């Protein structure tokens, strides 16, 4: 469930997890050449950070749970320019864990994507408890 977008830099008490190192998303003019986004209903690519955005930049999106008692959320970011995710580049599968048990739609999990000249980063925060959440790369390459 997507609910709100917040632009700007965020202070983090933990280092964000690297989504993509040596990313080709940034062009010579220090702007993004592709969009960074997520998959929405029907395999549609929904851009969060659009091409032409000056870097460094950050974007936060607030997610919630779809089921009662859900303790984790899967986030699959993509980069590209096509309207369908199947034609864009998947950047991995990231499991956000440690969400407190609550009725669906109650937890507020802020996921922040940051693009620097060299990297794309992801971090997550439980807005209710004001606490950073743990993120696992599903293929086991990294853990925050």
Question: Model-predicted segments: where are they?
Answer:
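Bacterial N-terminal signal peptides
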Residues: 1-5
């Amino acid at each position: 469930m997507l609910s709100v977008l917040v632009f700007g830099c965020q202070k983090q008490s933990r280092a964000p997890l690297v989504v993509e190192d040596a990313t080709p998303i940034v062009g010579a003019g220090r702007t993004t050449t592709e969009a960074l986004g997520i998959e929405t209903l029907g395999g549609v690519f929904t851009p969060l950070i659009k091409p032409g955005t000056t870097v460094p930049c950050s974007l936060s999106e607030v997610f919630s749970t779809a089921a009662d008692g859900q303790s984790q959320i899967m986030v699959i970011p993509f980069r590209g320019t096509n309207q369908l995710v199947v034609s864009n580049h998947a950047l991995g599968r990231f499991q956000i864990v440690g969400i407190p048990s609550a009725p669906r739609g109650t937890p507020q999990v802020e996921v922040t994507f940051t693009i620097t000249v060299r990297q794309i980063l992801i971090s997550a925060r439980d807005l209710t408890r004001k606490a950073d959440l743990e993120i696992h790369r599903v293929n086991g390459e990294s853990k925050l």
